[in-house]
Each structure stands twice: as C-alpha cells, then as structure tokens.
C-alpha cells in the first residue's frame, strides 16, 4: 500500500475559519490557541463539542475568529492525530 492510498480528504477551513494549535487549557471551556494567521487567541469550546470531543494541548483545530473581537474565537473542528500529521506534511500547519 503506497503512502498516497492512506491519505484522505480532510475538512479544510472555510473563508471565515483558520487552522490553530492548542497551546494551553485555561478552564471554563476555554483554551489558548496559536492561529496560522499569526494571532494568539482565546478560543471557546462550544456546548455541542463539550464531553463529546475532548480537546488537549497540541491538538490541531479549526477556529472561527469573532467578528467583533479578533483576539477571541470559537472552535469548530478538531483533527485526529493522523489527520493533523497529514496537514503538517502538506504544509498547512507550521510549528
């Protein structure tokens, strides 16, 4: 099985979303993320993700920055480890 066979189509950011890496867990369903547009934001874990999708430090997520407060965002998607590795290989995530 070649390397290309193991690749899959991943959810990519829409125009109002950006890739981010979780840096720190703040508590109260909030995390500190480093976004690929160069901004560090406080991201909120929405209620529909709480206790269903567990987010940890160094996870790759998609965030949607708030229109009215650019230093805050909502998490919209979390990538599995192998999906995050694929994004890094393809150059979408810079460490």
Curated annotation (Swiss-Prot):
Superkingdom, taxonomy of origin: Archaea
Classification via SMART domains: eIF1a
UniProt-listed SUPFAM superfamilies: Nucleic acid-binding proteins
Tagged with keyword Ligase: no
Pfam families referenced in this protein's UniProt entry, alphabetically: eIF-1a
Family annotation (PROSITE patterns): IF1A, S1_IF1_TYPE
Keywords: Initiation factor, Protein biosynthesis
Gene Ontology molecular function, alphabetical: RNA binding; translation initiation factor activity
Keyword GTP-binding listed: no
Domain S1-like: from-to ranges: 6-80
Function text: Seems to be required for maximal rate of protein biosynthesis. Enhances ribosome dissociation into subunits and stabilizes the binding of the initiator Met-tRNA(I) to 40 S ribosomal subunits.
Family label: Belongs to the eIF-1A family.
Name this protein carries in UniProt: Translation initiation factor 1A
Encoding gene (name): eif1a
């Amino acid at each position: 099985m070649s390397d290309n066979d193991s690749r899959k189509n991943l959810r990519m950011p829409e125009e109002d979303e950006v890739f981010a890496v979780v840096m720190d867990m703040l508590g109260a369903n909030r995390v500190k993320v480093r976004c690929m547009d160069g901004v560090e934001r406080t991201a909120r874990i929405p209620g529909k993700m709480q206790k269903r999708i567990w987010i940890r430090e160094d996870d790759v997520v998609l965030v949607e920055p708030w229109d009215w407060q650019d230093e805050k965002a909502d998490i919209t998607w979390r990538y599995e480890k192998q999906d995050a590795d694929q994004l890094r290989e393809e150059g979408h995530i810079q460490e």
